[in-house]
Design a protein with these regions (language model features):
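Acidic/histidine-rich, surface-exposed loop or edge segments in extracytoplasmic proteins
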Residues: 1-6, 37-43, 211-223
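Mature extracytoplasmic enzyme cores
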Residues: 12, 16-18, 23-27, 31, ...
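Short beta-strand and adjacent tight-turn residues that come in two discontinuous sequence segments
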Residues: 34
Length: 269
């Protein structure tokens, strides 16, 4: 059988590593999943990916090979999912973000479009689109509303597909692509047709999600799962350091990387 083997927030020594592995060997443990956590544990002296850390990792792999214990390491600090301090916002998980600007047509529109909400100061435009506005500019009043009963149903409604009025559907042929009429600062210059228009400035930004339960010196952004460059950046950061440590023992024991769980939310870009 395999077991989890946590190194807690940099509190690691060669003596402790040897004693742990020898104890596992005595009771028949055949392999370890070596993860590094830091939830509520005081910070120890070893910094993640430091030369001292590499020396301890090499010692652990050597001792595991000596005892015939397979060695599998989590692919990043923490137990979820694939990230670290080396991931910068442009290589982090991405999400769509947008702003809406209402403009009146029948004239040339020269206006600075609102910048969408961003995370970590990182934003890139994708497209600028316009469609006939459903808004008439009249506010919805509710001053005469009165709360009759402060209660909620004790059950959920039926799960199903929500239907919408056909008038709410934006027809594809009514959408105008204005991407090429917006400069790098987000200023729109457009000869707008008659009518009221909603202009969407669509872009992407970081989700801001970080690896879960990592040691203090290993906390960082999650890599972009839709980007080959981001995944290679993350993988190489680990393997460039680990491969020389692993290579002498690959024919003695099973050595690998694993992703323990997914607790970093979703991305849609």
């Amino acid at each position: 059988p395999y077991t989890y083997w946590f190194w807690m927030n940099g509190n690691i020594t060669k003596e402790g590593i040897t004693k742990d592995l020898e104890a596992m060997h005595r009771i028949g443990i055949g392999g370890v999943f070596n993860l590094e956590g830091g939830t509520g544990i005081p910070k120890g002296p070893v910094t993640y990916l430091s030369p001292e850390w590499s020396e301890l990792k090499a010692h652990a792999i050597k001792e595991a090979a000596r005892l015939g214990i397979d060695y599998v390491m989590h692919n990043c600090p923490g137990w979820s999912s694939s990230g670290g301090p080396w991931i910068t916002p442009e290589y982090s998980m991405q999400k769509l973000t947008w702003s809406e600007t209402e403009v009146a047509g029948g004239k040339r529109v020269d206006t600075l479009l609102l910048r969408p909400v961003t995370e970590l100061g990182y934003y890139r435009d994708i497209a600028v689109l316009a469609f006939p506005s459903f808004k008439n500019g009249k506010p919805v009043g509710f001053s005469d509303w009165q709360l009759l009963n402060n209660s909620v149903f004790n059950h959920r409604g039926k799960i199903g597909i929500q239907t919408y009025d056909k008038e709410q559907v934006i027809r594809l042929e009514d959408i105008i692509d204005l991407t090429n009429q917006v400069d790098s600062l987000g200023r729109l210059n457009w000869e707008a047709p008659l009518g009221n228009w909603t202009v969407i400035r669509l872009g992407h930004t970081s989700t801001g999600r970080k690896n879960c339960a990592a040691p203090d010196t290993g906390v960082g952004l999650e890599c972009d799962k839709f980007s080959k460059q981001a995944i290679q950046l993350h993988f190489n950061k680990m393997m460039d350091l680990l491969y020389p440590l692993i290579k002498p023992y690959v024919h003695q024991i099973q050595i690998g990387l694993e992703i323990d769980s997914w607790e970093v939310g979703m991305q849609n870009w």
